[in-house]
Amino acid sequence: MSSEAETQQPPAAPAAALSAADTKPGSTGSGAGSGGPGGLTSAAPAGGDKKVIATKVLGTVKWFNVRNGYGFINRNDTKEDVFVHQTAIKKNNPRKYLRSVGDGETVEFDVVEGEKGAEAANVTGPGGVPVQGSKYAADRNHYRRYPRRRGPPRNYQQNYQNSESGEKNEGSESAPEGQAQQRRPYRRRRFPPYYMRRPYARRPQYSNPPVQGEVMEGADNQGAGEQGRPVRQNMYRGYRPRFRRGPPRQRQPREDGNEEDKENQGDETQGQQPPQRRYRRNFNYRRRRPENPKPQDGKETKAADPPAENSSAPEAEQGGAE
């Protein structure tokens, strides 16, 4: 008889566990009676222990605690409160991360007899649709929003890079290559370093190209090669004091040349050239600050040569008149 008693004791242990689980509705083990993740299907075999009182009953959720995972539903027909556990929810909202039922939501469920009273099972929305879920439950779409938010800034980076690459490289083929090379570091380093680079990248790109274009019109290739060097230095060093020092040095030889021109030229040439000289002074003073004086000296000599020719021309005319 002792051996038979030993064999009968193990089945008694799970029964005690089930009864203990039902006495603690706040614990997750309370869902063992109504079914765990696989308990939804185990509700039918558990029908031997729990009787099905009613099926497809409509009710309004009285309250539901998402953290603890249980609440109560008020039946519409008998106005009776029915206990509901999160494991009893059969069709959850696919957008919700946890199983839950919203407060005041109308649901359809089966009423099962539990040890402490009526319990809900197979909870769905009216007509078998998924339940809406509690507003306090975590939303799965919250994790999908990040790539969508990152989309517009990336497009903005590409457009900004297209404008920069178009200014640097005149060819249309070189632009996409520059984009492919520039996209990778921005993805790794993300946004803060990108915004920090903006002021440093804009100044040389938008300020230097017009200066180079003006120099190429009047200067030789050697002068253009020398002009590229101070442009790089200006990016790293403070170049405003250099610009202020430059103009007074450039004015001295021009004034001397102007005095020589005034002595050699006649009244007609003097009346024509002063506006030209003023225009040249203003032009060089404003836009050609970062340039070296070497190419400008070449321009000054070129500018000084034609007046010398003009001065010789009136002398020849005067000699012919005599």
UniProtKB/Swiss-Prot annotation:
Organism: Rattus norvegicus
Family assignment from sequence similarity: Belongs to the YBX1 family.
Function: DNA- and RNA-binding protein involved in various processes, such as translational repression, RNA stabilization, mRNA splicing, DNA repair and transcription regulation. Predominantly acts as a RNA-binding protein: binds preferentially to the 5'-[CU]CUGCG-3' RNA motif and specifically recognizes mRNA transcripts modified by C5-methylcytosine (m5C). Promotes mRNA stabilization: acts by binding to m5C-containing mRNAs and recruiting the mRNA stability maintainer ELAVL1, thereby preventing mRNA decay. Component of the CRD-mediated complex that promotes MYC mRNA stability.
Name this polypeptide is given: Y-box-binding protein 1
Record text on subunit structure and interactions: Homodimer in the presence of ATP. Component of the coding region determinant (CRD)-mediated complex, composed of DHX9, HNRNPU, IGF2BP1, SYNCRIP and YBX1. Identified in a IGF2BP1-dependent mRNP granule complex containing untranslated mRNAs. Component of the U11/U12 snRNPs that are part of the U12-type spliceosome. Identified in a histone pre-mRNA complex, at least composed of ERI1, LSM11, SLBP, SNRPB, SYNCRIP and YBX1. Interacts with IGF2BP1 and RBBP6. Component of cytoplasmic messenger ribonucleoprotein particles (mRNPs).
Residues recorded as bearing Phosphoserine in the entry: 100, 163, 165, 172, 174, 312
Region called Disordered, residue ranges: 1-47, 118-322
Predominant subcellular localization, coarse grouping: cytoplasm
Segments of this protein annotated with the region C5-methylcytosine binding: 63-68
Domain note: In the CSD domain, Trp-63 specifically recognizes C5-methylcytosine (m5C) modification through its indole ring.
Gly residues: bias regions: 28-39
Residue spans of biased composition, Basic and acidic residues class: 290-303
Modified residues (N-acetylserine): 2
Sites of N6-acetyllysine modification: 299, 302
PROSITE patterns reported for this sequence: CSD_1 (PS00352), CSD_2 (PS51857)
Residue(s) of cross-link: Glycyl lysine isopeptide (Lys-Gly) (interchain with G-Cter in ubiquitin): 135
A GO-annotated cellular component: ribonucleoprotein complex
Site (described: Important for C5-methylcytosine-recognition): 63
Localisation per UniProt entry: Cytoplasm; Nucleus; Cytoplasmic granule; Secreted
Record-listed cross-link Glycyl lysine isopeptide (Lys-Gly) (interchain with G-Cter in SUMO2), residues: 24
Site (Cleavage): 217-218
GO terms (BP aspect): cellular response to interleukin-7; CRD-mediated mRNA stabilization; embryonic morphogenesis; epidermis development; in utero embryonic development; miRNA transport; mRNA processing; mRNA stabilization
